[in-house]
Structure formats: structure tokens, C-alpha cells
């Protein structure tokens, strides 16, 4: 099942539990999810996909005019009623030599399936 969207919600630390997750490399992304990412990568996106007892959460930042970008996963957490993911796009350092081709930074994380709404921060 593939889902997309986002919601803003105030999360308090007292009901928040950090979850174990894995950042998935390109060859580990399920084919159906990768296909949708390829279709949507030129615009910012958030989506989730579940298969075989795992949940994949994807966050993309749209087209960037150069290379040199990376994404940091700051937190993946669970509350009483939601899952959450917080990511940060990190741009190239000042003066860093970068590829002058358009790039489409995104990250996919994998965790055990939990049936809750996902909050993207």
C-alpha cells in the first residue's frame, strides 16, 4: 500500500518514543515505491509504503540545481497515536566543488510496520 500526504501536529516529549530504523540504499527500495519516487522526484514529496511487515517512509526535497546535497534523518518516533519523522536537507558547503547537473535528493527509511498516521517534520 502506498500513501502520501502530510500533517502538522504538536508532539510532546512525554509521549514520544524513538524508533529503530534503517536508511535504505537505492537497491533496497521496493520496486513499486522506487517507481513512484521517480515519478514525483522533481517536486518535494512525502510518502509511505508497506510490504512484508515493514514500513518504508520516503521524504524528497524536489529538484536542486546542483549536486552536493545530503539528507540527515534527525528522528523517527512513535507517540500514542502517530509516527513521526524529522529530516533536514543539508546543502553544499560554501566553496565546495559541486556537480552542475540537477539532482533530486530524497531519503527512504525502513522500520517494522506500525499502523499509525505519519507526521512529517
Put a short name on every predicted segment.
Residues 4-121:
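Exposed, flexible binding/inhibitory loops of compact, secreted disulfide-stabilized domains
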Amino acid at each position: 500500500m502506498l500513501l502520501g500526504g502530510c500533517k502538522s501536529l504538536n508532539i510532546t516529549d512525554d509521549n514520544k518514543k524513538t524508533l529503530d530504523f534503517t536508511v535504505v540504499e537505492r537497491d533496497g527500495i521496493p520496486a513499486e515505491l522506487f517507481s513512484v519516487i521517480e515519478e514525483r522526484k522533481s517536486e518535494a514529496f512525502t510518502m509511505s509504503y508497506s510490504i512484508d511487515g515493514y514500513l518504508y517512509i520516503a521524504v524528497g526535497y524536489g529538484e536542486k540545481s546542483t549536486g552536493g546535497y545530503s539528507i540527515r534523518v534527525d528522528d523517527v518516533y512513535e507517540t500514542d497515536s502517530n509516527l513521526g519523522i524529522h529530516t533536514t536537507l543539508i546543502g553544499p558547503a560554501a566553496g565546495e566543488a559541486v556537480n552542475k547537473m540537477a539532482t533530486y535528493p530524497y531519503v527512504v527509511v525502513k522500520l517494522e510496520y506500525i499502523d499509525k498516521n505519519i507526521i512529517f517534520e
